[in-house]
Amino acid sequence: MPQSPEQPDVSSTVSYNRVMLKISGEALMGTQGFGLHPPTVRRIAEEVKSVHDLGVEICMVIGGGNIFRGLSGSAQGMERTTADYMGMLATVMNALGMQSALEDLGVFTRVISAIRMDEVAEPYIRRRAVRHLEKKRVCIFAAGTGNPYFTTDTAATLRANEMNCEAIFMGKNGVDGVYDKDPKTNEDAKRYDSVSYDDVLAKRLKVMDASAIALARDNNLPLIVFGLDEPGGFRGVLAGEGTYTKVHG
């Protein structure tokens, strides 16, 4: 298939074989204030397909904040454990929506849930998930770690390590990397080209929660933060092109 101007042929320069793509649930909302926006879900699925077409094995974790966020529920008086489980179920809904969009594009996809719900998703079995990746199926890991008090950032880092991913790619909406302060409210915010995990923790930069950062650091797992709303952004960043921040040891 010929490449569009926004998606140059980078197949010869991509050095990754297996990666984790982490996106927030809010990324699926589009211009809506809640839920899934099907055209937006399809656009992101097309980004994933463009990388899958290069032969890269792809894991995904999608947050659930577009439907329900456990911390928000807890802050409003809901029991924390129950709120977190509700948030995990929201991630399953998002995973099923993304699976539908990917398979509509011809990409075989498996939703793998940390909480058993056999009618709609496979249970998490590491060796089976690895085999899916080897068969070039996209694996979407849902329901977080299956435990309350752990974020989907931590789940993404955990699964990336278990699946032997070479890096985590964090697709952000409206932000193209890691900044020293919020670029949406500070015009003088400066973007880092690269930053260490220790600096992220020490400076409390908003990348991932501290548990996820520490887990990535301790296993020497690089993290690339880029803008998901840029057409061809995921594919380009895999080739070292475009704007992004690399977080490393």
Curated annotation (Swiss-Prot):
Documented activity regulation: Allosterically activated by GTP. Inhibited by UTP.
Catalytic activity of the protein: UMP + ATP = UDP + ADP
Amino acids binding UMP: 64, 84, 145-152
InterPro entries: AceGlu_kinase-like_sf, Asp/Glu/Uridylate_kinase, Uridylate_kinase, Uridylate_kinase_bac
Enzyme Commission number(s) from the entry: 2.7.4.22
Primary location recorded for the protein, binned into one broad class: cytoplasm
Known pathway: Pyrimidine metabolism; CTP biosynthesis via de novo pathway; UDP from UMP (UMPK route): step 1/1
Cystine pairs: none
GO biological process: 'de novo' CTP biosynthetic process; UDP biosynthetic process
UniProt entry keywords in alphabetical sequence: Allosteric enzyme, ATP-binding, Cytoplasm, Kinase, Nucleotide-binding, Pyrimidine biosynthesis, Transferase
GO CC field: cytoplasm
Binding annotation for ATP: 22-25, 65, 69, 173, 179, 182
Record family assignment: Belongs to the UMP kinase family.
Record-given protein name: Uridylate kinase
Organism: Ruegeria sp. (strain TM1040) (Silicibacter sp.)
